[in-house]
């Protein structure tokens, strides 16, 4: 994959070349998207809209830390949707990990989550965030136990994952309404990189085959159900819907 690669660390240790080789990235000087190594973290920038700033994954501070400390925890819609109840903390595969926010919420309340991400740039951002998170004195211990990254296409990986999870979580990128308020700056940068999930409909069936209990699909409230498969089971929040589908129980 081609992207502009930049190193702002001041180091001459070749870390950028190692990063490019690991994730299969090629430097393209003219690409409007840039992956930048800063002294603090790895970040994604949209060079033709510098005011949008850089996007990076931070499990330790910022919004994630606030959500972990002061958010709804088990009461969050995503936690309810995957079925957390009492001692039941399902094993989850997040097949469209993105920047890892929902996966982190589930891990923070006790679920083991395997994140799948097919875009190599996004996977690199997630890996950088996990590396810093694993090293953190406060959350590193449980984060290493509960949150892991698999860099693979969900369409292929969903048929190969073992052991099978109880829940598969899907949050495919959906085209935003043109008339809606300006999409959050982060989403604009993100969508410029990955675009809409045009093959997302193909995820539902393999997800249902993989999950032993349920599949949860997060959708904007105006979006049709994934693959046009309606379900009466959903948790509805302001602006979103968590559609719930039955999985395929384990056979004895």
Curated annotation (Swiss-Prot):
UniProt family annotation: Belongs to the methyltransferase superfamily. RsmJ family.
GO annotation, cellular component aspect: cytoplasm
Organism of derivation: Salmonella typhimurium (strain LT2 / SGSC1412 / ATCC 700720)
Protein name: Ribosomal RNA small subunit methyltransferase J
Domain of life: Bacteria
Catalytic activity entry: guanosine(1516) in 16S rRNA + S-adenosyl-L-methionine = N(2)-methylguanosine(1516) in 16S rRNA + S-adenosyl-L-homocysteine + H(+)
Keyword field: Cytoplasm, Methyltransferase, rRNA processing, S-adenosyl-L-methionine, Transferase
One GO BP: rRNA base methylation
GO MF annotations in UniProt: 16S rRNA (guanine(1516)-N(2))-methyltransferase activity
UniProt-annotated location(s): Cytoplasm
Main EC class the enzyme belongs to: transferase
Database matches in SUPFAM superfamilies: S-adenosyl-L-methionine-dependent methyltransferases (SSF53335)
Major localization listed first in the record, in broad terms: cytoplasm
Role played: Specifically methylates the guanosine in position 1516 of 16S rRNA.
EC number: 2.1.1.242
Presence of the UniProt keyword S-adenosyl-L-methionine in the record: yes
Protein residues bound to S-adenosyl-L-methionine: 101-102, 117-118, 153-154, 171
